[in-house]
A protein has these predicted regions:
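C-terminal segment of classical bacterial N-terminal signal peptides
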Residues: 5-11
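Structured recognition/catalytic domains enriched at protein termini
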Residues: 13-188
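Short, small-residue-biased leader/transition segments that mark boundaries at the very start
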Residues: 1-3
């Protein structure tokens, strides 16, 4: 649900990953969150929470984010066995403004490994509630899997440490459900 607030957008967007638990201690705005693939900054890589969320393959997992500083855009969710296997930030189209180049749009990926969902919660106005969805966890066994949530920011000049996206991750221990079809080979 979005309001019709017509206030000028802030220069920076921020969000907190509320569910599942973030891998890094986040402040009230969600920082540190700039660097891909999972947040941190050059000056502050972040303090690990050591949080691990246990889930069963083939089951639903609730994702909740709180956009603490508004910027128009959308979100993407991805999953990989290791952080270095998470997808790169989306390709971005920019346009010239009187303040210099600004992001206009980002490529939205089709949901196939490692991307679970993209183009989530597209918005041009300040949200009035937390963003929530449920994803189906792949029926795999994976200790230490990395669930990534990124926010693409439109009408943004970009930041040196994160381009046009902010990043959060959660660590999942996934146990395949033997009652469901065999592990999906695309997630190997």
């Amino acid at each position: 649900v979005c309001s019709s607030d017509l206030a000028a957008p802030a220069v920076n967007a921020h969000f907190k990953l509320l569910e599942p638990a973030s891998w890094v201690v986040e402040d009230d705005k969600g920082d540190p969150q700039k660097l891909a693939p999972c947040g941190g900054t050059y000056a502050d890589p972040g303090t690990p929470t050591k949080a691990v969320t246990a889930v069963t393959g083939g089951q639903k997992l609730k994702i909740v984010v709180d956009e603490t500083v508004f910027h128009p855009g959308h979100y993407r969710i991805a999953l990989a066995r290791k952080r270095n296997h998470l997808p790169a930030d989306p390709a971005v189209k920019t346009h010239d403004t009187e303040k210099g180049p600004r992001s206009l749009s980002a490529e939205i990926a089709k949901p196939r490994p490692p991307v679970i969902a993209d183009g989530l919660w597209p918005h041009k106005e300040k949200p009035t509630a937390k963003w929530e969805t449920e994803i189906t966890v792949p029926n795999i066994t994976c200790d230490g899997c990395q669930l990534q949530v990124i926010e693409f920011m439109a009408e943004h000049p970009g930041v040196r440490e994160g381009g046009f996206s902010y990043h959060h991750c959660a660590v999942l221990n996934i146990k395949a459900d033997p009652a469901k079809p065999a592990e999906d080979a695309r997630w190997k």
